[in-house]
Every structure is written in C-alpha cells, then in structure tokens.
UniProtKB/Swiss-Prot annotation:
ATP binds at G7, I8, D9, C10, V11, G12, K13, S14. Phosphorylation of dTMP to form dTDP in both de novo and salvage pathways of dTTP synthesis. It comes from Campylobacter jejuni subsp. jejuni serotype O:6 (strain 81116 / NCTC 11828). It holds the Pfam family Thymidylate_kin. This is Thymidylate kinase. One of its GO terms (biological process) is dTDP biosynthetic process. The keyword Transferase applies. GO terms for molecular function: ATP binding; dTMP kinase activity. Keywords: ATP-binding, Kinase, Nucleotide biosynthesis, Nucleotide-binding, Transferase. Gene3D superfamilies: P-loop containing nucleotide triphosphate hydrolases.
C-alpha cells in the first residue's frame, strides 16, 4: 500500500510520520522532493535559489525528482507499505500556474501511473501556520508568507477533488489543530 501525507508546511506531517515509524518498522519511509540522491540536489536548488528559475523550469525539476523517486523508491518497493511525506499531489498544488489536466498528465508520465491508495491531508488555519512558521528558519518557499500557504492549501483541496475523479484513492482530512495523539489515533485507524 502506498500512503502519502499531504498538507502545507507546519501542519505536522513530519511529526505524524515519526510516530508511524514506531509502529510500521518494516515500512518504507520516504519524502518528496528529495527522497533520492538526485532529489536531494534538486531540492537544494529549488529551496535555496541563488538565481531566478522560471515556473516551467521549476515544474520540470520537480518532475525530474519525482521520476527518479519512482524508479528508485516506489517501483522497487511497490509490494510493501510505503509512507511518503508529500507526493505528486503537492507538486500539482504548488504548480498553481498550470492546468490540472496538464499537471496530471505530466505526473502520470513521471510515475508510470503509480498513485497512492491512501492520502492523509492535514489542514491548518492561518493562526496555526503563522505560529509554527515563526518558530523556524524559513527556506525560499516558506518566505513567501502565510497568504501563499493558505492559497496552496486551497489548491491542495481542489487537486484532491480533481484526483477523486481520475484515480481510485481514499482521503482522510484532519484538522492539524488537534493534539498529535488524537491525530495519530485517527491515522492508525485509517491505515488498517
């Protein structure tokens, strides 16, 4: 089973994944972008830009990472439990300047149509996101601000709705304001 955690920065994806590592010791834990050696280099380029990158070039770099991630991680472990911190869904949401049909086609190509079966979508409100952003050093994407993140979160919801019409997926939407213990319990039940 391929499971992905989706949500904007600071909603607790990493915290919940860490809790699952204690339970699913044989699972494959990964992340996008940056789940491979190539991906780490691309992630560095994308998050710490030293020069401007066009939106189209940025999209193609993320797709290159995704294709490599599929080859190295997803394809070789497709018969195991795979839990990923983000996926192509975030890629579609962050690429807000492009149409969903185009993004879906490009991601389908990069992933050879290998999609997650279950999606855990953690949602945060403006206050929660602002509070958590203020507690960390920001990368170039995080520096775009709270309004940017809320617009991405809105786009994530729209992408999930779009994907329900395209592929067979189960989606669990959770309020990130809940305690990490309560969220963990709901996630465990969803994964059974």
């Amino acid at each position: 089973m391929y499971v992905v955690f989706e949500g904007i920065d600071c909603v607790g994806k990493s915290t919940q994944i860490s809790l699952l590592k204690e339970i699913y010791k044989d699972a494959i834990f990964t992340l996008e972008p940056g789940g491979t050696e190539l991906g780490k280099h691309l992630r560095e380029i994308l998050l710490n830009k030293t020069h401007p990158i066009s939106k189209r070039a940025e999209l193609l770099l993320f797709l290159a990472d995704r294709a490599q991630h599929f080859e190295e991680i997803l394809k070789t472990n497709q018969n195991k439990l795979i839990i990923s911190d983000r996926s192509f869904i975030s890629g579609m949401a962050y690429a807000k300047d492009f149409e969903n049909d185009l993004l879906f086609a490009l991601n389908s190509f990069a992933l050879e149509n290998f999609f997650p079966q279950k999606i855990i979508f953690l949602k945060g409100d403006a206050n929660l996101i602002q509070e958590r952003l203020s507690q960390k050093e920001l990368d170039s994407i995080e520096k775009r601000g709270i309004e940017y993140f809320l617009s991405v979160q809105d786009k994530l919801e729209k992408v999930l709705h779009f994907l329900k019409e395209k592929i067979s997926i189960e989606i669990l939407t959770l309020d990130a304001k809940e305690s990490k213990e309560k969220l963990h319990q709901q996630i465990k039940e969803f994964l059974q």
